[in-house]
Curated annotation (Swiss-Prot):
Function of the molecule: RNA-directed RNA polymerase that is involved in transcription and genome replication. Following infection, it catalyzes the synthesis of fully conservative plus strands. After core assembly, which consists in recruitment of one capped plus-strand for each genomic segments and polymerase complexes, the polymerase switches mode and catalyzes the synthesis of complementary minus-strands.
Species for this entry: Lymantria dispar cypovirus 1 (isolate Rao)
Subunit structure: Interacts with VP6.
GO molecular function: hydrolase activity; nucleotide binding; RNA binding; RNA-directed RNA polymerase activity
Keyword Amino-acid biosynthesis (UniProt): no
Pfam annotation, one family: CPV_RdRP_C
Domain of life the protein comes from: Viruses
Protein's recorded name: RNA-directed RNA polymerase VP2
E.C. numbers: 2.7.7.48
Family membership noted in the UniProt record: Belongs to the reoviridae RNA-directed RNA polymerase family.
Cystine pairs: none
Amino acid sequence: MLPNTELHTTEFSKTRKFTRQSFKQIEQLTASLANDRVARHKFLFNNSLPLISDYSGEDSNGHQLQATIKIPDEITNPKEYDPSDYPLAEDESFFKQGHKYDYLVTFRAGSLTNTYEPKTKMYKLHAALDRLMHVKQRKSRFADLWRELCAVIASLDVWYQTTNYPLRTYVKFLFHKGDEFPFYESPSQDKIVFNDKSVASILPTFVYTCCQVGTAIMSGILTHVESIAAMNHFLHCAKDSYIDEKLKVKGIGRSWYQEALHNVGQVTVPVWSQFNEIIGHRTKNTSEPHFVSATFTALRAKRAELLYSEFNDYINRALRLSKTQNDVANYYAACRAMTNDGTFLATLTELSLDAAVFPRIEQRLVTRPAVLMSNARHESLRQKYTDGVGSIAQSYLSSFTDEVARRVNGIHHDEAWLNFLTTSSPGRKLTEIEKLEVGGDVAAWSNSRIVMQAVFAREYRTPERIFKSLKAPIKLVERQQSDRRQRAISGLDNDRLFLSFMPYTIGKQIYDLNDNAAQGKQAGNAFDIGEMLYWTSQRNVLLSSIDVAGMDASVTTNTKDIYNTFVLDVASKCTVPRFGPYYAKNMEVFEVGKRQSQVKYVNAAWQACALEAANSQTSTSYESEIFGQVKNAEGTYPSGRADTSTHHTVLLQGLVRGNELKRASDGKNSCLATIKILGDDIMEIFQGSQDDTHHHAVSNANVLNESGFATTAELSQNSIVLLQQLVVNGTFWGFADRISLWTREDTKDIGRLNLAMMELNALLDDLLFRVRRPEGLKMLGFFCGAICLRRFTLSVDNNLYDSTYNSLSKYMTLIKYDKNPDFDSTLMSLILPLTWLFMPRGGEYPAYPFERRDGTFTEDESMFTARGAYKRRLLYDISNIREMIQQNSLALDDELLHEYGFTGASLLIDLNILDLIDEVKKEDISPVKVSELATSLEQLGKLGEREKSRRAASDLKVRGHALSNDIVYGYGLQEKIQKSAMATKETTVQSKRISLRLHEVIATKTRDYRIPTTPADALHLYEFEGEEVVMDLLPHAKHTSYSNLAYNMSFGSDGWFAFALLGGLDRSAILLRLDVASIRGNYHKFSYDDPVFKQGYKIYKSDATSLDDFFIAISAGPKEQGILLRAFAYYSLYGNVEYHYVLSPRQLFFLSDNPVSAERLVRIPPSYYVSTQCRALYNIFSYLHILRSITSHEGKRLKMVLHAGLIAYVRGTSSSAILPEADTV
């Protein structure tokens, strides 16, 4: 018997609370959908469901809208495959120039047959198209596409308490083709298999489309009636070629919001200071200047020409009905959801080559510089521009050369190269002979740059390797993104990458010398858009957002020479003695104007840059299974270089800032207040009179055009875009459609469910301030976890199978498989208890209210709820903390927790199955081979520094401060190589050992398992009582009540209320964290749980005299030491009591991340202050409680109530140095 799949009628659907009964009901229903294909089919296509065709309801802004479901005949009765859709050139050497379609055309899936002679071009083409339809459409992120769709539909059913809504009708019309699903994912074959050959080729992608539209509905971006507009538009695009049409119309479908803001006339907006603080609000006129508004007519005509008529009608209606800035924001978010289905756009590399990498000559060619000095190989050593755009850029960049050279001289470049190498793919594979030479283990590890460099370390100082790499073709690697066409990047091998490393090192020094570059310190929160918030709230500004179209393809040899000129100028002033195969030496050079050659001392950096500049423009090739080796024409800038982004950033700022200097020399004033550049994205802010700002903006655009770039500058007085972040009049309009919850570039098996949940949590954090309804997002994430991330399958030795099953089945649901006598092991699936989603080291997801034994409920946890060990407090909350305080009890309610499944979830976490896999794999890695490889690399870099680091770490260990190898500089190379070795898949032999060891652990743990407790659990025993004192909201509550600061911060919302209570970001704390993060090269990812900080802090608190050895061990220079010492001192303000929690910057975004912000909102009895650390600890309690319970907060003062055991614990630990882990990741 299948369980009742009527999720929408459950008690949980009505109350959004878990009673003991309703929890079991949801657990069983979601487990059924996770594990039973028949149940999924019945749930999605229940014959009793009503089918809607006409629907009326409210749109995003509350206006009535009517819509009719329309599924084109081209989708339900697709055409037969037509070979002429992918025409070949006459000589069959490639696709015909200007072919119509770059992506998968819509046709009947079964009509793509391959009847051509094997080995012919047509046979190979059809085999490739078959892979495009079956393999490249498979993009699932968390589970197979039908489970993901079930998660979305389940959340909609429960949220709206009905199955009667349009998206379900689309699902049934599109995918219900009998008792079987029309297609399914086959992980073993790594492809989609069609059961029904009559369906459209593109139909699997529409499962993801439905998931994305459902996500937009759940998160409040689309209403049900607007979902019809979205689905109708997507289906209209798919009549011919879905992705081609989507790419064609996406821009024009979103380009109307400036006109809508212009029409609004006046808005009240927040005013920001330059220190990321709201200091007031003002009325602003949103009317755009004539040179902007003059473009609106042409845009309207283009929309009418290109867009599906119903979608264009929706936009015209939005223009007509938008009366406020909030109206425009809501309609704009809806239109973005209607033009991006969140899928990663994939096609054959051969079809996308022209659009991705074919050289483009835009506007005009750049003149070349005059060569002033060259070497015997006729490579330029020094060059200069006398006129043109090159001269403009050089006039600005030349002012940095002396300081950049000084900084470059202070770098050990061989060591920097070793640190630059990662565990990513090395751009080539070992030949069979090379594999035999290095041995099987090392050959298996060599799929990483660091190991490949170690294998060929003996050749590092030989120039021949560089010349050899220059002759080898550069391989293309395809990359897919959401909402952008497929790209092709250059898969450079280590030697070719090395060639671009010195120009990268030189170029990136500029980042620290001016503030033009947006590279570097990205905090992940509103700090990143601080300048945009400030300038869009100012008067008399013109905001320019520039995107350079196809920049890599537009950088010609001549354009690249602008950067080469700067790099060679810097290199000529360096004194670098050695770098790879280059040694500083006297060389024969030729100078312009001198008849005889001269001998000149040329340092290593100069030699390296000269060779790179002379050989930086070679063609790329792609090994096509259809056409053989396809060579791209000369001229495209290889996008996989070390300095790709740096080149673009430095070049563009040279052109823009150089133009500013030229204008000054021509007697024209500068209106350029600031610029920010990252790669091919440019933000310019002009301030002054309307005419002056416009003339300067046009002048800059002209310079970029003269440099060979096609630029589209969006000018506005209201809005600015940089790095896909849109800010409008001091408010953030985040692009929710850019976050793909359900798809990824490459589908991969979910090995670690806890890591998959971390990924889900991170994606939801990204979405949180981009959506209007975080509560809907919470439910969506819950059902994703419950249906997509509950099943874990492992291989169990046949001899241990039954005993393993018997031990675990007491605590969780298991699925047994029939044993095959031909194999030693059999699969067993563990169905995780639903409560695993809410556990620390489990899912760490915000919990819905759980019923306690006395009938009361725990808090409904908001999406701002902290994660990490703090989630352990839920166990005590369910066990009733208030009662524990009253009865002075410390015991968990084991019986109730077991009934909910927390005991089984805790057991699963304690078993640590996934770490067992790593443990077994680690045992098989030869430490001798790892050491040999690391030693071969150490000879190339700072060998003495590494030995010194290891000695310092050894001395610390003797004094009781053992450091982990991953932070000791002297073991860094070993750790990288070890990581590469661990990335290989476990063998059958290893699986058997894992099974045996797991059986031993299970037998030990499951005899009488109870959730373990620790003395530190006392820190969770606090409560808050409401008092009748209404708390004042902070002043910016009023300033943000007119225009929504973000989509989830409308007046009266949880986001707005949390901001009104706690305030905004602590700038000084963020800057400090960014400084510390910069030491690790992990800007926005730094956490106080970072091992460098964590282990250093312990030494700082307990044995400060050992800090010098600590700094030597981690190889921290004077600057890094100062940063860490400041961070240690700042962090010590939190006291010595350990209380772990994790909040990500994106999860808070605008909200304060400083626990002190909660101090004014809570009354703490004086008797609780039993040590100097109490104030900081109690602020953390208060802060985390307000974030967690913001939905039920009534705006009144709270009183803290503590358990006697907590006070005793704080009193007893206040003098010992325990790391306070208020983690911010």
